[in-house]
Amino acid sequence: MFHQVWAALLYLYGLLFNSMNQCPEHSQLMTLGMDDKETPEPHLGLWYFIAGAAPTMEELATFDQVDNIVFNMAAGSAPRQLQLRATIRTKNGVCVPRKWTYHLTEGKGNTELRTEGRPDMKTDLFSISCPGGIMLKETGQGYQRFLLYNRSPHPPEECVEEFQSLTSCLDFKAFLVTPRNQEACPLSSK
């Protein structure tokens, strides 16, 4: 009888613990579904960088002086190629243009992007419940970080809270939110 009561108590404790632990399993992160089309149409257009998370602040240091970043994702000149243009507004007001070329790796449903000229860098796309939001995981030589982007420069605060909660569960304890106090720099067409 004692063993049955003890087993029932342990079972109830386990249920209670699991209900309080809101962290999803890493495998439960939903990758963005892409079919085998040449470009991921829904992901093209303007995006604003909102926040980043990493195991350490050193992996987010590149964003220390950033006030805001606006990106434009466009289809590239070749199949399965994406052109990314950005302008970075630094905290001291300077506009810094950047551009990258991404290559979608082969395979139906694959969401892995490779950055041209940076063979060590891999980018995976994930969906989040935040309206107009997308989450990227960048992995390179000596760093890994999650980045939150949104179609709006000022998404609801719940989006940032959800992102921080999710990444914290994955042991990405360093967190950075861009201030977005200044006007975004205009995007260059070059």
From Swiss-Prot:
Which segment of the chain is annotated as a signal peptide?
Answer: 1-17
Task: List the record's Gene Ontology CC terms alphabetically.
Answer: discoidal high-density lipoprotein particle; extracellular region; extracellular space; high-density lipoprotein particle; low-density lipoprotein particle; spherical high-density lipoprotein particle; very-low-density lipoprotein particle
Residues engaged in binding tetradecanoate: E138, R145
Xref: Gene3D superfamilies? 2.40.128.20
| Superkingdom | Eukaryota
Q: Name one GO molecular function term.
A: phospholipid binding
Per its database record, what is this protein's job?
A: Probably involved in lipid transport. Can bind sphingosine-1-phosphate, myristic acid, palmitic acid and stearic acid, retinol, all-trans-retinoic acid and 9-cis-retinoic acid.
Give the protein's recorded name: Apolipoprotein M
Gene it is expressed from? Apom
